[in-house]
Amino acid sequence: MAYYLVTAKPIESKMEALRQWLDSGEIRVMKPFGQALHMGLDNARWQAEGVAIWEEEDYCVPPLAQERAAVLDEYFTELEVKHVSKGEGWKHIEPLKKIWGDP
């Protein structure tokens, strides 16, 4: 299995709809990638002004192909991935501000 640090620019006008989709649980049950995608997006952070970052587990070649087709390309632009070890991405970005606001 492979893990990636994902960076992307959210389409601001669509973020409320994405949050509602996450809250509905529909992304979580998408097969085979729903659990990983839901966790990644739900815990995404702000890397810089207007750039989101999260770690994602994926098996596709190219990386995130199914996730992009089903969800990501509708809500994000300029998506980039960097291979990381499991948990390395989260450790690196954990101190950053969550895109959905802190509890």
Regions found by a protein language model. Give the residues of each.
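Conserved short beta-strand edge segments in small beta-sheet-based binding/regulatory domains
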Residues: T77-G89
